[in-house]
């Protein structure tokens, strides 16, 4: 039989390149092809025998393996060396695949296939149900108004990704330590030993079961509040991370756990405690004329909307539903916790109303009738099992500052929001009662003993100055023809001196090292600042204004730099007022140092702006005492006593190796002026008219009506 000759080997054809085949476009089969050259990508040519077609392709499909990725075997008659040729062809394919992978790694362009895959994934995610998205999305968007934390979103599933901060034992313990150091002394709504046993020692919290939703929400709120009280340096030292990252992580965990615990439906006060801690930092700006200027605990700089102001109404309603004002039926421990929580809500309600400004949700009558302060004791004096009554302590305790704050909100409501309190006699009587209750708490207080004692010592003095300022310049706008008159010019304290004393105390906290732990808690209150500016505007004593203006200017700059979520009406009013005061005082106080006025509200250019005797002192240039009034004459306490009055009846000398003096303004309503030689140079009607215009501008800012310095 005649031997058949070898069959000619099938030639490798130049087929469409990889990219053109994927894009399904016609390829000119050049090397490189025109399409790849114009696209600026690497062209991967394809050279192989053509795949069988027709009857041959059908037969191959029937005989192909189940694995779709398996190579297709081409059944072609071949000579004895066909296996070697097939191996060579396979090696070439492998080399082409390797080249293709290398080119994909080196190329910055995304192939069509990758883009289509991404589009498919994105379109698939967009079709997921909204409830599933709530579980995957860790943040509360501004459009929800913060209602998600109330449990109104319809999803109660926890976000394990963001709640993991509670599972990180080391981070949660450090944040708890920060809370006990920076927050607990000034926001006293929790029992310190119980928190320590729970978060630092791993014991159960007040008998709650493990992983109870209320306890988890409280733990997350503690971490969140502690994170906001950190400085950037402290954040790096403790966590090796920026403060913003720690705050963002803690906030998401707090919102997640609050949503799970549902404050609207929870029957325990622990959830409300967590909710209040979340809200404390949230209200837009602390604007307290009795300058609390405190409790910036959670979202002030992050959420400048009115969401938290609205959520405050939920907290008040929840507190009433839990019967917090009465607190009956509990043991001694439960009664103390309820009283602390209710008065903290009243305080936040008062501060929030001043920051808008608006009427408080809790009326004066309701706040007065339900005012039952907790005991003046330390947390170590009682525990959850205490059933007997614990008497008050003398001297500084864990609750001293909070008790003063509760008295501040009670007096502030009477002086600012009670229409019936109009005559000078009743207003002075309210201030005197407030002073008697608060200054009594300073007895035996050594301001040099601890930073907390130092902070409490100076803040209480600041509160008393603020109460007197509220008696003279209430926040309530007077529409009648008979406004409240100021105190007698021969016996009354100086309005400007009171305002400057408050601003100086704020600077003291921000400059003295002993106030570092509480600086997050204290900002410049806008009411004393506005009063000081308006008094400088109408004051005729140029020498007095020259001494007072650097303090006012420094306070205004600090207010603008630190308060980013202030009310629009308040910000506009302060800007306009400052611009007008600068414009008026510029000719009389013009020196080499120029202060630039606001370009938005000032009608004149920078050439007409105010110049002051010297640049307002920076924080680094102020001495450790932080006393911006240190170069002025101060009157001693004995000089301010009335005839026959004993100094011991007014205050006790603190137990200290370096005795401290209470500010002279705090001894009596007819005390001498803060600035030596100062006289009352402003007529009562003109002084009141200046403040009345400031208050009216807050309510009538959109009307554009003319006034003495805001037009």
From Swiss-Prot:
SMART domains: GAL4. The keyword Nucleotidyltransferase does not apply. Residues 372-394 are annotated as: Disordered. It comes from the Eukaryota. GO terms for cellular component: nucleus. Keywords: DNA-binding, Metal-binding, Nucleus, Transcription, Transcription regulation. One of its GO terms (molecular function) is DNA-binding transcription factor activity, RNA polymerase II-specific. InterPro entries: Sec_Metabolite_Reg, Zn2-C6_fun-type_DNA-bd_sf, Zn2Cys6_DnaBD. It is found in: Nucleus. Residues 17-43 bind DNA. SUPFAM superfamilies: Zn2/Cys6 DNA-binding domain (SSF57701). Transcription factor that specifically regulates the neosartoricin B biosynthesis gene cluster. This is C6 finger domain transcription factor nscR.
